Amino acid sequence: ATSRNAYNKDLYMWTSNNRLYGYDLSPILIKSNLFGSRMAGDFMYVNNTVYRPAQDCLQGYGKGIILYKVEDISDKSYNETKVISLYPDSSSYYSDGLHTINFYKSICVIDGYKNHYIPFQKIYRKLFDKYRSWISCLLVY
């Protein structure tokens, strides 16, 4: 987990005997770097091998995904090896970043994003917030 004040840089291990609560911070600092500290999804289990997806935040939030192979994990140690980095194609619609990858059975979900410049965005947001209830009534009818 990354702490709120770590700016996506410090990744620590937390341990518990219960999956739902009672986690304690381990003294192990897994990584202290904007490249690969912030998680990009759940751990993946493929052919008895564990992989950890992480974000590349060197140039900003979630510019790409790094996949690490977990070599060793215990209460006292953690070791991983980089397998591959994934970045969006500059000509794709979501060209500004990839920040999530998850698998479930035969389904893979990858989340990307594109920053759009919207002229007068602040004015639009203020008007929308001011008249939100009125607009909602129009949409219902």
Region locations from a protein language model:
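Carbohydrate-active catalytic/glycan-binding domains of CAZyme proteins
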Residues: A1-Y141
